[in-house]
Amino acid sequence: MTLPVYSRADLSRIAILVALFLTAISTSVVAREFRAADTQSEDYPTVQALRYMGRVIAERSDDRLQIRVFHSRQLGEEKETIEQTRVGAIDLNRTNVALIGSFVPAMNVLAMPFLFRSIEHLEKVLDGPIGNEILSSFEPYGFVGLAFYDSGARSIYNSVRPIHSIADMKGLRLRVQQSELMSDMIRALGAEPIELPYGQVLTGLATKLIDGAENNWPSFVTTDHYKHAGYYTLTEHTMSPEVLVMSQKAWQSLSADDRQIFRDAAIQSSQFMRAKWKDLEERSRRQAEAAGVKIVTDFDRKPFEDAMAGIYAKAQRDPATAALIERIRKVE
């Protein structure tokens, strides 16, 4: 039997191919994929931020750790994905504080109406000791809080009439998040709250199941709600942020070094997201104006704030909640 004779160049090429093959096998064995959920569309700033975070984590872990982002409600509506994250079926989740407040009580404070004076006030709270304390409060409930994302200011829009006073709210059927706090707020303003999953709002507007809803500029425009609701009143009643959480199950499986990689990447993604958000917010408002949406800025704000007295009285029965609200108000 005659054995094949290989040249030095052939042997070199074979060695390279074997090395690449072994590297591929090694990578496939040690690489781990984390599933991240976001109900927003693919080009939304929070989805882009999750992908940015994934790139940072992959780079810092030499591709051992990978994030796969599921957007556009691919893993379910937001409340469903929160529950899946709590039990460990989803590893990472971007969610609004009003929804996760059903699981983590401290988050309801950030969703309180008319609590923040401005976006700058909000960011000072989130970036400081209070924000860190709130993120730490997730752990007893099956989550690990990693970072806050911006969500702008939520305002009320509808298809029936411009809202200049609280009297104009009477009788309007307004979609709210699946949150007791949000339902109480709309009811206190004289309207009828209709709890609907985010993905059903457009159909609800088109079929007149609801008269309107409340959300920020990008959500109003990117979902095409502006095509069915021609009045947008700058109530800016809440400035509740988004929050990025990880399941306790996934977190406990990480080494101390890898946990730090995730924390650092999450903070970086928050800054990345804020820049993307501010640009989209401006473009969304211009698009709504160009489409003929009537933007109401001259509404009587004080009666709206006064109507929240009962909501605050209920929340402040808990001494810890009352103290947190007071601390937030004192941040300059």
Per-range role (PLM):
Residues 13-26:
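Bacterial N-terminal signal peptides
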Residues 26-32:
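Bacterial Sec-dependent signal peptides at the C-terminal "C-region" and cleavage site
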Residues 2-16:
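Bacterial N-terminal signal peptides that target proteins for export
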Residues 32-121, 129-131, 136-332:
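N-terminal secretory/targeting leader peptides
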